[in-house]
């Protein structure tokens, strides 16, 4: 009996250990509601709260459970653990495309989704509701009289001219851990070879590596970093302390991520999920659109320099295991320089 109990404990412990890890969980709406929408998302609660609040205002009696995870943990929850969520939201467009392509999303059409621009929908399964640029975030006070960079070439020259100032104080994504960071990095290499030169220069100055945009911005605020590269501009511009930062959209090209949503194939409340998707698309693309990003990040003025990442099977190229291993090996050589 004791042996059986020990074996059972090991099995249960093993199951707990393999469960996906949530960074944050919040509940909105009536605490005792039996009409609940479960959302799993890579977006911070503060970033997405306005959309949740506006939906609940139109759907009284509904509750929303909002779970924040990393992009890799999102994949684990949906694919490995078959968790029952109603809506899946992520900034990692390639991983979202893979979910839809591999049969983890259900088809959905409505009046709201029928009028979307071509770049905002793929196969009636994956829907984009924001356009968010990758930005260079700089500490205004930390730069002093040093001129701000306007392009990647400017940034390279700046780092080479002032190594004593920037050593250990430049940050970017750890693309081994961050799905969005990996997406941005691979798209940068498609746009220009300058990415590898910049990565080598940052690596030579002991670049600090981070999981997510919010941590990089916090590090710039605290003074641990002076520069954060490929940060989500939407996260920086929506902060109350945004005046402390210079948010630079590189003039050579600005990579633009589309945050996407899908309804998973096993959604327990698919009808409620459809209502939420309608709301999301209407607010994002309708005649009275209310973008989640700040108007100061209006991209229409920079259309010529935009490198807008397109949803579709082209995003799956760098998810091929051989290509991914080769990319990460080259990235580690450039950024770690061991």
What are these regions (language model features)?
Residues 42-43, 91-221:
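Extracytoplasmic ligand-binding site segments that recognize negatively charged/polar headgroups
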Residues 94-98, 221-244:
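A ligand-binding cleft/hinge motif common to bilobed small-molecule-binding domains
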Residues 105-114, 125-128, 243-255, 265-266:
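Short beta-strand->loop
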Residues 264-321:
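Mature extracytoplasmic/periplasmic domains
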Residues 34-37, 58-68, 84, 166-169, ...:
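A local structural motif
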Residues 135-142, 185, 257-272, 288-291:
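A bilobed periplasmic-binding-protein/Venus flytrap-type ligand-binding module shared by bacterial periplasmic
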